[in-house]
């Protein structure tokens, strides 16, 4: 197994109110799924101490990498979770380097979503196997406290394993071992072939959708339909009442929710270029997202009553921000 240790930027450490996410020491590894002859670059963060911990598996967006979600990966680690950032070959930064915009458009084909879902299942299989074998730190992992998150195409991946329905049946997508989900920049079906309730009504576990007023469509209307902030927010309306939430951030764009991910693409690809005022607000947005998502995981994976109480009316929201939950 290939491994190199990284030292992240130093900042305020925790997930509690007022904290700023930081990138903590992490290990970059390569995990190979022999059954598919597929090697996944991984970034792995362990929480300090010896206590039992939950696990969160994060999926990057199109053209991203295991660096996706770094902005909150450290905060989730500080909240008591093992955090695993998965890189998906075929829809990652290497695909963009090899083929540019055309390769990323091709990466939205169904076979890449199938591969991504299988990647997530393989990672959870590995978590389970290592935990049951009680291999070193893996003996700490609570198999009843696994969550999944993703940004953009990673959110599409998370929607699939959470139970989203498709016009064509997609057997084997649902991952029952995940107990809660966070989708950054989620999206409904572009063609609207199913109603929102038909698409998302079967998701029966806690699901947090996160978007913002500038969260547009980097692919600019692939398939003839352009996704906008309101369509991303509409995912909430399709989810069953009782275990759903929506965080809307005023002035946050699509790249805000990548969590420092696709910076290298942003410098080369027009749709990712940002207004200076959006970038200036990003640190505050990242801090708020890190805190609220940390509380979400603690409430729904660890049964933390204080975190659940904080989510009833999260502090720190601006006048243009919105929080909905029921």
Mark where each language-model region is:
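Serine-hydrolase catalytic machinery in alpha/beta-hydrolase-like enzymes
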Residues: 35-141
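N-terminal export signals
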Residues: 5-21
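The feature captures the conserved acid-bearing segment of alpha/beta-hydrolase catalytic domains
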Residues: 172-251
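A domain-start/cap signature at the N-terminus of enzymes
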Residues: 16-46, 316, 320, 326
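Short beta-to-alpha linker loops that shape the active-site pocket of alpha/beta-hydrolase fold enzymes
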Residues: 87-91, 187, 252
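Primarily recognizes the serine-hydrolase "nucleophile elbow" in alpha/beta-hydrolase
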Residues: 125-202
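Alpha/beta-hydrolase-fold serine-hydrolase catalytic core, especially in secreted/extracellular enzymes
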Residues: 250-255, 260-326
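Glycine-rich His-Gly loop
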Residues: 58-62, 151-152, 186, 212
């Amino acid at each position: 197994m290939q491994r190199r240790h990284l030292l992240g930027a130093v900042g305020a450490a925790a997930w509690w109110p007022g904290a700023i996410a930081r990138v903590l020491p992490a290990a970059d590894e390569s995990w190979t799924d022999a059954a598919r002859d597929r090697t996944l670059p991984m970034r792995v963060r362990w929480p300090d101490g010896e206590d039992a911990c939950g696990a969160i598996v994060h999926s990057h967006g199109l053209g991203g990498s295991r660096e996706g979600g770094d902005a909150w990966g450290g905060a989730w680690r500080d909240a008591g979770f093992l955090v695993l950032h998965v890189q998906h070959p075929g829809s990652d930064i290497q695909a963009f380097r090899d083929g540019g915009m055309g390769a990323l458009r091709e990466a939205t084909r169904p076979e890449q979503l199938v591969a991504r879902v299988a990647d997530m299942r393989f990672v959870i299989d590995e978590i389970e196997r290592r935990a049951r074998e009680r291999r070193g730190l893996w003996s700490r992992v609570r198999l009843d406290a696994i969550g999944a998150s993703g940004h953009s195409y990673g959110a599409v991946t998370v929607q699939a394993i959470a139970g989203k329905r498709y016009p064509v049946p997609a057997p084997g997508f649902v991952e029952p071992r995940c107990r809660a989900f966070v989708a950054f920049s989620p999206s409904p079906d572009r063609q609207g072939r199913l109603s929102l309730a038909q698409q998302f009504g079967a998701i029966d576990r806690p699901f947090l959708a996160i978007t913002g007023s500038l969260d547009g469509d980097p692919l600019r209307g692939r398939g003839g339909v352009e996704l906008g902030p309101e369509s991303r927010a509409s995912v909430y309306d399709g989810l069953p009442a009782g275990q759903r939430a929506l965080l809307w951030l005023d002035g946050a764009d699509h790249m805000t929710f990548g969590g420092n991910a696709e910076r290298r693409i942003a410098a080369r690809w027009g749709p990712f270029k940002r207004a200076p005022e959006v970038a200036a607000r990003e640190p505050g947005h990242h801090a708020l997202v890190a805190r609220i998502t940390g509380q979400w995981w603690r409430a729904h994976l660890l049964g933390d009553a204080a975190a659940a109480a904080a989510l009833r009316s999260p502090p720190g929201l601006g006048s243009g921000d919105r929080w909905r939950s029921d």
